[in-house]
Amino acid sequence: MMKFLILNGPNINILGIREPDIYGRQSYDDLLRLVSGHAEELGVGVEFYQSNHEGDLVDAIQKAYFDGIDGIVFNPAAYTHTSVAIADAVKGVGIPTVEVHISEVSKREAFRQVSYIGAVAVHTVTGRGLAGYNEAMDYLAKLLGERK
């Protein structure tokens, strides 16, 4: 069975509280339920990890390699625009990674137009709300199925 890491960066743990006009009213627990249900439908296993700390996210990406994770669905949140270290980790381990953003970052502030993660990801999904995570899993399942 394929296994995906669902990795979330800073402030994703306060979904539903943080700027609901941008990110919606669904909570982080709602996200976990949504993704778990879709993973079951796809027949893939999922592990979840969220951190507000850059180094923890790097560690989680490296751990995914050693744990044999097949793909990563990653919402790096604000680190999208700032973290060369996280981008280097994604590139370094070579696990197919789909970058996900709940909001449509291309229609937001100028500083959000740069994505270090997008440069090393196999695909990016933005502006689809929480459903973007399921889209990312679909993409990975198809990509990895074609590679076998």
Model-derived features: positions:
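Extreme N-terminal starter segment of soluble prokaryotic enzymes
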Residues: M1-L5
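N-terminal nucleotide-binding beta1-loop-alpha1 segment
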Residues: I6-I12
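Glycine- and acidic-residue-enriched helix-capping/strand-helix junction motifs
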Residues: L15-D29
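Short beta->alpha junction loops
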Residues: E47-G55
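Short, electropositive alpha-helical surface patch
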Residues: D56-I72
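Mid-chain, well-packed structural core segment of small domains
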Residues: G68-S106
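Short beta-strand elements at the ligand-binding edges of bilobed clamshell
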Residues: F111-L130
